[in-house]
């Protein structure tokens, strides 16, 4: 049986912390779908199409990773994609509480959908897209936390 995992997120923008999780998840599962959420309730810096394109370029070196945008309920999206595992990153205890609620709801909606939680490597454990954007807005150097093409796109957005 092929294990098709889905790693959903807003990825606004995709960071090296996300890539850490993506790379490790790609080595664990037959296929990994990087699902970029439309997130209409969030005020994103990058459009959905831009976030998908940035993620595609960031993950291009991983043969078993595909990238797609979505706006559906996660359980419905997973079912449509024939996904059987959700991958989520955990940085803090607060992340765990929220992710546990989501995992239980997703399991209720799609009983065959498992949630797997990965902790980022220590180097990326404090990174979030929001923090990176905030530091960049104040002219802080965030190049270490982003793939080079994403860093360039962020600088262009902030001009």
Curated annotation (Swiss-Prot):
Residues engaged in binding substrate: 10, 42, 74, 88
Main location: cytoplasm
CDD domains given in the database record: PPAT
Catalytic activity: (R)-4'-phosphopantetheine + ATP + H(+) = 3'-dephospho-CoA + diphosphate
Alphabetized GO MF terms: ATP binding; pantetheine-phosphate adenylyltransferase activity
InterPro entries the UniProt entry points to: Cyt_trans-like, PPAT, Rossmann-like_a/b/a_fold
Localization annotation: Cytoplasm
Binding residues for ATP: 10-11, 18, 89-91, 99, 124-130
One GO BP: coenzyme A biosynthetic process
Record keyword Zinc-finger present: no
Reported cofactor(s): Mg(2+)
Origin: domain of life: Bacteria
E.C. number: 2.7.7.3
Family indicated by similarity: Belongs to the bacterial CoaD family.
Quaternary state and interactors: Homohexamer.
Name of the protein in question: Phosphopantetheine adenylyltransferase
Organism: Cronobacter sakazakii (strain ATCC BAA-894) (Enterobacter sakazakii)
